[in-house]
Amino acid sequence: MNRKQCLETIQLLARITAADDNGYVQCVSCGVIKHYRDGMQGGHYIPKGSSSYWALEIENVHPQCVGCNIFGMKSGAAAQEYTLWMEDMYGREFVQEMLEKRRNPVKLYKKDYEQMYKEWSELIKYHQNRIGEC
């Protein structure tokens, strides 16, 4: 296991966990509703490339449509809407704490990635069963 595999897994986990029993999930930025496998991504509130601290924390990854995640976070209103959603979900103090800790370095080792991957894969299987995919 490596960082890339864990990033892919946590992004899937974020989408499937938020999905209803039919597999549909809502974009936290624009509100569009789609199947978690159809045009939806696990978007990072704090970009994964700028924070080793938050990159693999589930509180930082939530469902976003492709448009909001790829384009809207850089040049559109998606980032502002994501911030409002985060404050509503976790509270303003937690979001401020996230921003303060975003530059804190975290060193992960292969065993850390293996443990995360194993734990998240089990949760994904649970949710696949919940929505009737297994």
PLM features: residue spans?
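Short, charged surface segments at domain edges that flank catalytic/cofactor-binding sites
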Residues: 1-26
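Active-site metal-coordination segments of metallo-dependent hydrolases
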Residues: 4, 51-55, 73-75
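Histidine-centered nuclease catalytic patch
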Residues: 26-60
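Short Cys/His-centered divalent metal-binding micro-motifs
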Residues: 32-35, 60-91
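Short microdomains enriched in Cys/His and/or Lys/Arg
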Residues: 48-61, 87-100
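Short flanking/linker segments adjacent to small metal-binding domains or redox-active Cys/His motifs
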Residues: 97-134
